[in-house]
Amino acid sequence: MEQPESWFAADYAEARAKFRAAAERAGAALAAYRNPDARQPDGGDLTTDVARLGPAPDRAAKVLIVSSGTHGVEGFCGSGCQIGMLE
């Protein structure tokens, strides 16, 4: 088991990469949705990454949605918690 400190990132790109890698290791289906109206401070794309575990939502009896980063700054903490759940 990884140490919890390894779940957290110092910036958006690192948080995104860690989340996507953890989702892939967990066997999740991944999708990314680019925000056409916003950019990172360095000009890079801002995206919402979606990791789905289990059956497609239209075939699942119950669905749990967990999100972070809706307002920006809390994304690093939320992403770390999500990575911990995936690990």
Where are these regions (language model features)?
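Structured catalytic-domain cores with a bias toward divalent-metal coordination
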Residues: 1-87
